[in-house]
From Swiss-Prot:
It comes from Enterococcus faecalis (strain ATCC 700802 / V583). Its EC number is 1.17.99.6. HAMAP family: QueG (MF_00916). SUPFAM superfamilies: 4Fe-4S ferredoxins (SSF54862), ARM repeat (SSF48371). The gene is queG. One of its GO terms (molecular function) is 4 iron, 4 sulfur cluster binding. It catalyses: epoxyqueuosine(34) in tRNA + AH2 = queuosine(34) in tRNA + A + H2O. [4Fe-4S] cluster 2 binds at residues 200, 216, 242, 245. HEAT-like PBS-type repeats lie at residues 303-328. It is found in: Cytoplasm. Catalyzes the conversion of epoxyqueuosine (oQ) to queuosine (Q), which is a hypermodified base found in the wobble positions of tRNA(Asp), tRNA(Asn), tRNA(His) and tRNA(Tyr). This is Epoxyqueuosine reductase.
Length: 389
């Protein structure tokens, strides 16, 4: 007769859960010092759950917890559609491909809970059992739960690395008052490898599985203000997220799984044309990108990033659309458009200089004025040296 745990494992496979593990619900004391240190040093992104105690102690958010069930879903790393070679395109990081993974994980977790409730021997037992599902918007540090539940180990890039799927997995968990036999944690397998640390273009990784999230390109692409100039070139054409620390990891070599249809990327969504993004309406944005995890911050960060990506790709054909962005109501878009023109218009700067000078004559926002002045300086200095380019 299989145990309840064995039944859950079997059902998880039927539900399309790629990996499952069980751990106790004791406090994550090992996280306490590092979580406080991250906050004190200003390394947090601000997207984390703000109550540190609730991140460490499961009993703070769940009465009498006994176990935590951790699940992982593997996501694809390569698009099956062929990439068109036409206009300049941006890119969403792989964790934003397909339907928003939060919805997919919640669906699997709720179905798993429903199955467990069906296994109750009596109505009294069923009423006594309690569950609390959550994904990365909840209190827990998902990677710490998954590591303790035996799904994988936390790499130097701060991500959970599984034997089967590398780090290309979404994580979720269920806290319950049912006692399960815990699985064995997975020991760290990075060894002396530092490829993610040396590969990170901003030096965000601290070397011990933690990061300065403020320096992470993924974080920078999700902010709503002006992106600091140091990060703009390093962003390349990735308008949401950053996969570098995953792509360089030896555990991820050759990993590409297509288990879940709802995770499959569509080229026009995850490799969008950049120029049309600059003038996309709210309705069009919601229709094209609203179901992606990468749309959660709205269109402004993505439009700002599209202006940066066009400059990085040498998208001079988009200069007319970029000039139109100088009239945008949002200072971030006006300022970033000015910077983009300064990078792109060096060969034929006259039209851009005219637009930038007009912007200066009417602009009141200091950060926009500063960007416009820098762009004008670049274009006027390059104007005299075009023959040498």
């Amino acid at each position: 007769m299989p145990t309840l745990k064995e039944k859950i494992i079997q059902e998880s496979q039927r539900l399309g859960i790629d990996k499952i593990g069980f751990t106790h619900a004791e406090p994550f004391i090992e996280l306490e010092d590092s979580l406080h240190e991250q906050r004190e040093r200003g390394y947090n992104s601000g997207f984390e759950h703000q109550n540190v105690e609730e991140r460490i102690y499961p009993e703070k958010t769940f009465e009498h917890p006994k176990s935590i069930i951790s699940i992982a879903l593997a996501y694809p790393t390569k698009a099956q559609e062929k990439m068109p070679r036409d206009e300049k395109r941006g890119q969403f990081a792989r964790a934003s491909w397909g339907i928003d993974y939060h919805h997919i994980l919640q669906d699997r977790l709720q179905k798993l809970i429903a199955f467990i409730e069906e296994q109750a021997a009596t109505e009294a037992e069923k009423e006594h059992w309690r569950f609390r599902p959550q994904v990365d918007t909840g209190e827990y540090v998902d990677t710490a739960v998954a590591q303790r539940a035996g799904l994988g180990f936390i790499g130097k890039n701060g991500l959970l690395i599984t034997e089967e799927f590398g780090s290309f997995v979404y994580l979720g968990e269920v806290t319950t008052n049912i006692q399960f036999e815990p699985d064995e944690p997975v020991p760290n397998g990075c060894g002396d490898c530092t490829r993610c640390i040396t590969g990170c273009p901003t030096g965000a990784l601290l070397g011990d599985g933690r990061m300065n999230a403020q320096k992470c390109l993924s974080y920078q692409t999700q902010t709503k203000g002006m992106m600091p100039e140091d990060y703009r070139k390093k962003m390349r054409n990735v308008i949401y997220g950053c996969d570098i620390c995953q792509l360089v990891c030896p555990y991820n070599k050759g990993k590409d799984f297509h288990f879940h249809e709802e995770m499959e990327p569509k080229i026009e969504e995850v490799y969008p044309k950049l120029a049309p993004l600059l003038t996309i309406s709210n309705k069009e944005f919601k229709q094209q990108f609203g179901h992606l995890a990468g749309s959660w911050r709205g269109k402004k960060p993505l439009q700002r990033n599209a202006l940066i990506a066009l400059a990085n790709l040498g998208g001079r054909e988009a200069i007319p659309q970029i000039i139109l962005c100088l009239n945008d109501q949002r200072p971030v878009i006006r300022g970033t458009a000015a910077w983009s023109l300064g990078q792109l218009a060096k060969r034929e700067p006259e039209q851009s200089l005219e637009a930038l000078n007009y912007l200066l004559s009417v602009e009141t926002e200091e950060e926009v004025i500063e960007e416009a002045q820098k762009a004008i300086h670049l274009l006027t200095s390059k104007k005299g040296s075009r023959s040498t380019e």
